[in-house]
A protein has these predicted regions:
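N-terminal [4Fe-4S]-dependent radical SAM core
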Residues: 1-35, 48-59, 74-82
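Short cysteine clusters
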Residues: 39-46
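Short, electropositive alpha-helical surface patch
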Residues: 101-107, 193-214, 272-283
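A C-terminal junction/extension of Radical SAM enzymes
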Residues: 222-227, 237-294
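Terminal RNA-binding accessory module
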Residues: 264-336
Length: 336
């Protein structure tokens, strides 16, 4: 059965260290901004098991806006305060964040921020919200449309409430706006929506997506340990995926194999990784974790949040843990 979850308002935790909320720096000029983990959909291919039908999630997070901006400014300053892209891409849908327009406005006011982009399935978007986001400074909406067949679209979204016609109307509205760009970003799920991908390409080109950036960003479905795995799907290799994209590029004469430079993405210093794999760290347990079997902890100086697995101790417990993962400052640890 779908899990029951609690919602935590994050107002005094470090915003570096957890994949579910806060900020992620992967060593480029793009900073991932994750103000909320919630999502109204339960897509059958979701890599983060989001939405009402989640089986693995224990907690949802909503981050205080002032705290988010404070930590964002810290990372921007570290990177040199120039040519920064703030990419709002949650483990759910950013439109679930109640202060999204204000977030975009505040991000746009940070010195060095030149692009603000957002990833969404669009079900919570309206023409009014699009206007407000554009006025606040949003540069581009990456809109996931995974099928143009209404029944298949509902199946992929994991809910009968998914309204494809609404999302298409919003897509066309965004494309008509001169001050905001649209990128259509379907997930290609082999054996399920193969025949939809050419239709989506034709649709994106027809409505005028990609005024400044590429019109399409086709995503390869990947099976993740705690993500959803549609029955009967056989994964494409990356080689197969790129060969298919190359064929479609040739047919439609549009760019489908994307590179970082297509978006102005380049390497930039990454904020320091404070703890190495195998290192012993004293932490305090401060919250339930994002997924079942996890707890959230902070280090002694409250500089990083650390996900602790394989233990269930009371909140407030101080304990030593061993870091087992630290890539891009996303920390996972086990108790000693």
């Amino acid at each position: 059965m779908p899990c029951c979850r609690r919602t935590v308002f994050v107002e005094d935790l470090p915003l570096i260290g957890c994949i579910a909320f806060g900020l992620i720096d992967r060593g480029t000029n793009v900073i991932q901004v994750r103000p909320s983990s919630m999502c109204p959909l339960s897509c059958i291919f979701c890599s983060t098991d989001a939405g009402p039908k989640s089986r693995h999630r224990l907690t949802e997070y909503v981050v205080d806006l002032d705290l988010l901006i404070e930590w964002f400014e810290y990372i921007v300053k570290f990177k040199g305060e120039k040519k920064i892209e703030a990419h709002i891409d949650t483990v759910g849908d950013p439109l679930a964040y109640p202060r999204l327009v204000e977030l975009v406005q505040r991000l746009s006011e940070v010195k060095g921020v030149e692009v603000i982009s957002l990833q969404t399935h669009g079900v919570l978007l309206t023409e009014k919200i699009v206007d407000e986001l554009a006025e606040a400074g949003l540069s581009r909406i990456n809109l996931s449309i995974d099928a143009l067949d209404p029944l298949l679209a509902k199946k992929l979204a994991g809910t009968e409430r998914y309204d494809l016609h609404h999302v298409m109307r919003i897509a066309e509205y965004i494309a008509s706006k001169p001050n905001i760009d649209l990128l259509i970003a379907p997930v290609w799920v082999p054996g399920i929506n193969d025949h939809e991908i050419p239709k989506i390409i034709e649709y994106a080109l027809k409505i005028g997506a990609g005024k400044k950036w590429p019109a399409l960003g086709i995503q390869k479905y990947e099976a993740h340990k705690r993500g959803r795995k549609p029955r009967g799907v056989k994964l494409m290799s990356w080689g197969q995926f790129y060969r298919k994209l190359a064929e479609l590029e040739k047919k439609y004469k549009t760019k489908l194999i994307l590179r970082p430079e297509d978006f102005g993405i380049h390497k930039r210093p990454m904020i320091p990784i404070l703890y190495q794999k195998g290192e012993k760290v004293l932490v305090e347990i401060v919250e339930k974790g994002w997924l079942k079997g996890e707890l959230l902890a902070v280090d002694k100086k409250r500089q990083r949040v650390i996900t602790v697995v394989e233990t269930q101790v009371p909140i407030g417990t101080k304990m030593y843990v061993k870091i087992i993962a630290n890539k891009h400052n996303l920390y996972i640890a086990k108790p000693l």
